[in-house]
Amino acid sequence: MGRARLASQRHRVRIAALQILFEVDETDHAIDQVLERRLTDEPMSQESAEFLRRLVFGAWEHRSYLDRIIEEAAPNWPVAQMPGVDKAVLRIALFELLIDDVERTPIKAVINEAVELAKQFGSDNSSRFVNGVLGTVVTRYLADRDDTVEE
């Protein structure tokens, strides 16, 4: 499979993860039911479904830790008052950058994807905010990481 096609599939998976996390965070819907409904309504390859599950469950299970990282990087923006899209985008990106131990997506690819999601689904200022938070986190936590491979 070509890089462009893989990147496009991963972009669609990240959109699905964003929408699932947003729904779960804004409602009382059970995360596993929302995820399974999405997989039923929008079939995808096994690899994409596994990536989606990893992003959704990983970002959700680690949200307390990820939210602390967000608040460290943006102390004037409490996570509880943050727009839901921005919060979900940041949780997904930070999960990929700081926690995901199945595969290591390059920093640049994670940030570019997060900024694109923020532009597509967030407010006028979302992409700048997301880029700023992720830039701060990368400087603080990942400055020594070698990322020579592109997604």
From Swiss-Prot:
Record's keyword annotation contains Membrane: no
GO BP: DNA-templated transcription termination; transcription antitermination
Domain of life according to the entry: Bacteria
UniProt-listed Pfam families: NusB
One GO cellular component, as annotated: cytosol
Listed InterPro entries: NusB-like_sf, NusB_fam, NusB_RsmB_TIM44
Keyword Transcription assigned: yes
Keywords: RNA-binding, Transcription, Transcription antitermination, Transcription regulation
Single Gene Ontology MF annotation: RNA binding
Functional summary from the UniProt entry: Involved in transcription antitermination. Required for transcription of ribosomal RNA (rRNA) genes. Binds specifically to the boxA antiterminator sequence of the ribosomal RNA (rrn) operons.
UniProt similarity note: Belongs to the NusB family.
NCBIfam families assigned: nusB (TIGR01951)
Name assigned to this protein: Transcription antitermination protein NusB
Organism (species): Chloroflexus aurantiacus (strain ATCC 29364 / DSM 637 / Y-400-fl)
Gene: nusB
